[in-house]
Amino acid sequence: MGCLLDMKKYVNEELDSKIYIENNVYKRLLMIQKERVKLETGGIIIGYYDEDCRNAIITECTNPPKDSIATRKCFLRGVKGLKSLLKKKWNEKNEYYLGEWHLHPGASPQPSITDIFQMKKIENNPKFNCQEPILLIVGEKYNNFEISLILFKNNKQYFYIESEP
C-alpha cells in the first residue's frame, strides 16, 4: 500500500469514512477523460479496506473486458477475464472487487437512474459478495475533470466529496 498522503482522498462525514484513490489510478482516469473518448467505457474497481473496514483504498480501475458493449450513452460491462484477474489480485495482494467505474463522456459524472439501479442489484446480489459496492463515475463539469464517488449501503446512496490529504 502506498502512503495515504500520496492518494486522492474523498470523504463522507455521515458515515465517517473515506475512499482513497491511488495517484496512478487517478492520473489514468484523468487521461481517459482528457482524450475526449466519444463512447462510454468502464470496468471494475479493485482495492481493499483498511483494518477498521471503514476506509476503502482503490488500487485499480480495470480496462473494459473484451466482451463489454459501449455506446455514446451506455456502457454494459462484460465479464471476460475478470474472474481470473480477481483471483490473481486476491492471491498476490489481498485485493478484491470493490465496485464499478465508468465514463460519462462530455457529461456530468452524476449517476443516472440506470447506474443507481445496477448498483443496487450488485449490492443485493450474493454472487458479487459486495454488500457495499462503490460507483466511480468520471465526467466533467464546466469543462473540468470531475469524479463522483458513491457508496451503496443498506439500499442508500452515500456521496463522497474530494478532500485535502
Language model regions located:
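Conserved beta-strand-loop surface patch within small alpha/beta domains used
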Residues: 1-97, 106-165
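Histidine-centered divalent metal-coordination motifs
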Residues: 102-104
